Swiss-Prot record:
UniProt GO molecular function: membrane insertase activity
Region (Disordered): 42-66
Compartments where located: Cell inner membrane
Native source species: Pseudomonas putida (strain W619)
Gene3D superfamilies in UniProt: 2.70.98.90
Keyword field contains Transport: yes
Protein name: Membrane protein insertase YidC
Membrane topology: Multi-pass membrane protein
Listed GO CC annotations: plasma membrane
Taxonomic placement: Bacteria, Pseudomonadati, Pseudomonadota, Gammaproteobacteria, Pseudomonadales
Amino acid sequence: MDIKRTILIAALAIVSYVMVLKWNDDYGQAALPTQNTAASTVAPGLPDGVPAANNGASADVPSANAESSPAELAPVALSKDLIRVKTDVLELAIDPVGGDIVQLNLPKYPRRQDHPDIPFQLFDNGGERVYLAQSGLTGANGPDARSTGRPLYAAEQKSFQLADGQEQLVVDLKFSDNGVNYIKRFSFKRGEYDLSVSYLIDNQSGQAWSGNMFAQLKRDASGDPSSSTATGTATYLGAALWTAGEPYKKVSMKDIDKGSLKENVSGGWVAWLQHYFVTAWIPAKSDNNVVQTRKDSQGNYIIGYTGPAISVPAGGKAETSAMLYAGPKIQSKLKELSPGLELTVDYGFLWFIAQPIFWLLQHIHSLLGNWGWSIIVLTMLIKGLFFPLSAASYRSMARMRAVAPKLAALKERFGDDRQKMSQAMMELYKKEKINPLGGCLPILVQMPVFLALYWVLLESVEMRQAPWMLWITDLSIKDPFFILPIIMGATMFIQQRLNPTPPDPMQAKVMKMMPIIFTFFFLWFPAGLVLYWVVNNCLSISQQWYITRRIEAATKKAAA
């Protein structure tokens, strides 16, 4: 049975790593070519069906008429006269042409730990990549559907900042056309990553006005700047949306390459996901919207929606709005904003284990204030939960260790007659009340927990740049000096010494190689995960040593 146990351990090690790689295939970002630099100078485009414009606006705006075909137009450069907005958690730039958010930084989330003054940049439309949030009014009278191009909004000032003691900031952009006055209003709240984008329509034209609000996210094919593939893994980079039948539906870049998607949805949301961060447009819950994904002529990927028709009589007023979230994947906040949005923190097929683990880990952290110590306490709780199972396993291995001399005698007695040897071993196990597979059970049980915790540490933004102590300054990435993986390998070696020695020399050599193999695998795993395994091994060693000594003492006493 030792060879079976050896094979099982080796298989589980390989399977666990293959499962992680499989996760990369199913959920990871596609290896797509980076966007051409020329595309990064393209203006925010307009939806399909917009008539040819003499100002060269591109064909990004979704048409209110589903049968319309896109007009391909020459792109133009972005307006240099951007409107800057700064709150305590957001720094963004709005292009007055169309009122799109073309740049967005997250000052609370540094790009790198060694440069805390440089914020992570989520949106960018003027550098080497394209990622922006667009919105407008299309349809029969929508200003974004004009033949002369998208509206040029005016603001009272070019810079807005949320002042100390101020809880809300409102930025109004104004535009008038043919007797209709438009205000595009951005409303920000202190400490919040969600903002409201509203359109106030004042129809003084003398005739009825009609149109539709649209909102969309546009991104190029460049990689995820917030993700690391050091372990051969990558988190999901792509679009997602909510439908009545599927609260979290992913639409990858490959899916969009295959063809556009169009669905009628009541309420819901559309989002673009990357490692740790998400951007989502959230329309009113009562609105019946047309959700669409597609790829534009510059190779950018678009997901968005067009809202229901808005009618404003002559002399009347109307307002329509949507919410934009652009920030970290904080599960509690996302759940408040819209049903299913918290599922963008994607724990994969083991979500039913990962979510309770994160919930417990979060509560421990609220008491301790350090994610490293929280992982240690979590490990102790998990070990306590599996204590009866582990104890039974260690008792079985201790008895195996006690009968090792008898097994050696059987090997000497039967030599190469493996059939008789196996029969004699099974009779011995039955007589000594030993379960030869008992030592494998804890490994089988721990693997789902191990993999679920891996994805918790990989996906949860709370772990990003979270320090523990000393040289571990980020639990979400590998140990920079590989100290924890080496300690983990040492604990595996010690634990192995407590196990019964396989009677076959080849099996014994294979078992001795296992700590080295595991250490190699763990070199590039997140430090938080290795910390969990080190603590788990230390607790297992203590428990196994105690049980082994008790059984050996009882065996000696019975023999006397």
